[in-house]
């Protein structure tokens, strides 16, 4: 499809698409997202799961060079990353911080948090 475009056409398309604002993704299940909001802001009582916001910020903006931005990540991606931490397949977290947190989270906790994060901006 793009093979027939001239170099100028490609530049024009690039200029056009670079001005487009991404549409925010919203949670598909609002009840799940509300549960995720509670976990994100307050952790899971009695399990040792801290509030995500304590490291990643109240809006998921992160702290550069320390804790990554989470806001706006797709729910499937966030869930997959939490699960790889839980399984020990991902190990780029200093002092095993995320691995120890994810190990204490249920599958439902992870899905709820992922759903909430998707709607953050």
Report residues per predicted region.
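Axial heme c-ligation environment in periplasmic c-type cytochrome domains
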Residues: 1-10, 14-28, 64-69, 87-121
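Sequence context surrounding c-type heme c attachment/ligation sites in exported
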Residues: 7, 41-53, 63-80
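The canonical Cys-X-X-Cys-His
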Residues: 13, 49-58, 113
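Electrostatic cytochrome c docking/interface patches
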Residues: 19-45
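Alpha-helix N-cap and coil->helix boundary residues
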Residues: 31, 47-50, 93
């Amino acid at each position: 499809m793009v093979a027939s475009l001239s170099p100028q056409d490609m530049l024009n398309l690039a200029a056009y698409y670079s001005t487009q604002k991404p549409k925010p993704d919203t949670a598909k299940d609002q009840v799940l997202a509300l549960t995720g909001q509670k976990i994100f802001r307050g952790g899971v009582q009695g399990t040792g799961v801290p509030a995500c916001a304590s490291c990643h910020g109240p809006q998921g903006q992160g702290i550069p060079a320390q804790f990554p931005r989470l806001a706006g990540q797709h729910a499937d991606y966030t869930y997959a990353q939490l699960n790889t931490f839980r399984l020990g397949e991902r190990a780029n977290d200093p002092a095993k911080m995320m691995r120890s947190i994810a190990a204490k989270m249920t599958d439902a906790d992870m899905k709820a948090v992922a759903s909430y994060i998707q709607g953050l901006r």
